[in-house]
Amino acid sequence: VEKPISNSMKDVNKLCKIIEQEKIITQVGCNLRFHTCIQKIKELIESKTIGDIISVKVECGTYLPDWHSNEDYSKGYAAREDLGGGVVLTCIHELDYLYWFFGEIQEVFSITGKFSNLKLKTDDLSAIILRFKNNIIAEIHLDYFQKPEIRSCKIIGTNGTIYWDSSTNEVKVYNLKKSKWFSKLKIEKYNKNEMYKKELEHFFKCI
């Protein structure tokens, strides 16, 4: 199922009810979970490489007019609320993988709206703070107007820091005791199709 699965919680609950009643095997298309670097970060978290997690800072900044340069960006789904657009729903992958990493969310604080001069009818900036039930705090920045684009994740723990930047596709760990960065994974030329293949393979296993 393409995300967002609905534009209202009422309809989400309806869909969930149908899925449960009909016993339909369902997967939402959040492909970033299947990115090799994101999977490596999850592995490092679970092995407690940096001890207990305290806080997280995630950023996804992009420039919407560059997404499909041969099209009018203002007419695309990402720019229109009626088509499920907006920076929060379109760039939902960050929220999804943090939920995958850390579980249920207890509190949400957010400032979200249209702040740039782009021709949009929806939100183009969201600053979000999450408190997970395990007391981990996450700061998330999403925007449609940033060049050069950035997608990064920094996770701070009691024994160090995990850092990933999509522009280099390197996952690094800072060891607090040794006061030094260590490369845990570096992909020279990442083929984005790989994560979609992994996503499909996972779904095929489920059915």
Where do the language-model regions lie?
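Structural detector of well-ordered beta-strand residues that form the stable sheet scaffold
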Residues: 1, 25-27, 57, 78, ...
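Contiguous beta-strand/loop segments that form the cofactor/metal-binding neighborhood of enzyme cores
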Residues: 89, 95-170, 197-207
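A structural alpha-helix within SAM-dependent methyltransferase catalytic domains
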Residues: 16, 20, 42-45, 99, ...
